[in-house]
Amino acid sequence: MTFAEWAAFYDKKNPEDPFSPTPGYDLYFVPEKGFCEVRFTETMAIIGQLTGDGRFFRDKVEEVARKLGYKEGGTICIRKEIRAYIRLFGYCIEREEKLPDGEIRYHARHKKTGKWLRASPMFRYKGSGELAYGVTWEI
């Protein structure tokens, strides 16, 4: 697919927040895989807007991050079902932490590597009320 086709696909899946390049992020496009924004802060590799093969882009970002000495990754998950997202990336939920506002933070561990992941409620979209999660993980 072309970049325009991938962007249209992103917009269809996320109509409340259509694609627009994020300042400070580098954009990577692979026609058969999709696109991904990435930013390296002082301490973390952050994946921004992404559409297509999330595992492919996560693996590529982690590969670069390891070479640069990064230990943590982060992203915002806008999927409707955070538990499915956690499983998709190979993690098993170890603990659900109920927060004061009634939302749940998920603590998970990767099934093969044993590395941790944490998914915390971040914000709700005004139109749909869908909850987005801030996700951090051990690289």
Task: Go through the PLM ranges and name each one.
Residues 41-90, 97-102:
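Acyl-donor binding region in acyl/amide transferases
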Residues 1, 10, 19-22, 28-31, ...:
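Alpha-helix C-terminal capping segments
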Residues 92-111, 116-132:
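Conserved catalytic-core motifs of GNAT/GCN5-like acyltransferases
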Residues 1-17, 43, 138:
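Short amphipathic alpha-helix that is part of the acyltransferase structural core
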Residues 15-32, 88, 108-111:
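Short, solvent-exposed secondary-structure boundary motifs
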Residues 21-55, 125, 139:
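Conserved donor-binding loop and adjoining core beta-sheet/short helix segment
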Residues 30, 38, 107-111, 133-137:
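Short beta-strand element of the conserved SAM-dependent methyltransferase core
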